Amino acid sequence: MPQLEASLELDFQSESYKDAYSRINAIVIEGEQEAFDNYNRLAEMLPDQRDELHKLAKMEQRHMKGFMACGKNLSVTPDMGFAQKFFERLHENFKAAAAEGKVVTCLLIQSLIIECFAIAAYNIYIPVADAFARKITEGVVRDEYLHRNFGEEWLKANFDASKAELEEANRQNLPLVWLMLNEVADDARELGMERESLVEDFMIAYGEALENIGFTTREIMRMSAYGLAAV
């Protein structure tokens, strides 16, 4: 596996590593902050699930603090301006969907796309992380599977009523993931993470989620093609 080989060669204190880390670390911090905000917003939209969603939000807040500690451990200041711009399009799409009461779209963005993005990135990062960050990230990724599962279960229970909106939300938002991956490909490589591995792991996680919700293999392939068009 390329990441495992790269871990033997990485210099966590080099200027090039720290420069790339300042953006990657900011992205994971901002991603957890976005998740905290999104789950709290979903709690307003799904009052019957309020307690569970608030619990998920608090978990994301703990993750954010953990990743902030990872940056401090390497004496790196995260580039939060870059990270906020990085998530801007998904953030605006979630915000617009929430304003229209589109719970299905909000769940696809947060519980499927963002969580699968995180699962892929964290799993690829763990083998090449410094010891401190590895321990933090291993704990975080276990939680992210639980968060994805929440969205899966709700959408599965409401699949027939949600299917058309899910397909449209996928069409609008999946291409953004590939643009985001392309934007950080060089920085990720500096940290020992290959873009191809990130793409593969994301597609596996996202495809599993769509299958669990109720989509057929043919439908998943068609939906995935919207992302590939942006590569």
Swiss-Prot record:
Belongs to the aldehyde decarbonylase family. HAMAP family: Aldeh_decarbonylase. One of its GO terms (molecular function) is transition metal ion binding. Its EC number is 4.1.99.5. Keywords: Iron, Lyase, Metal-binding, NADP. SUPFAM superfamilies: Ferritin-like. It comes from Synechococcus elongatus (strain ATCC 33912 / PCC 7942 / FACHB-805) (Anacystis nidulans R2). Fe cation 1 binds at E32, E60, H63. Gene3D superfamilies: 1.20.1260.10. Binds 2 metal cations per subunit. The catalytic dinuclear metal-binding site could be either a di-iron or a manganese-iron cofactor. Fe cation 2 binds at E60, E115, H147. Catalyzes the decarbonylation of fatty aldehydes to alkanes. Requires the presence of ferredoxin, ferredoxin reductase and NADPH for in vitro decarbonylase activity. Involved in the biosynthesis of alkanes, mainly heptadecane and pentadecane. InterPro entries: Ald_deCOase, Ferritin-like, Ferritin-like_SF. It holds the Pfam family Ald_deCOase. This is Aldehyde decarbonylase. It catalyses: a long-chain fatty aldehyde + 2 NADPH + O2 + H(+) = a long-chain alkane + formate + 2 NADP(+) + H2O. It is an enzyme of class 4 (lyase).
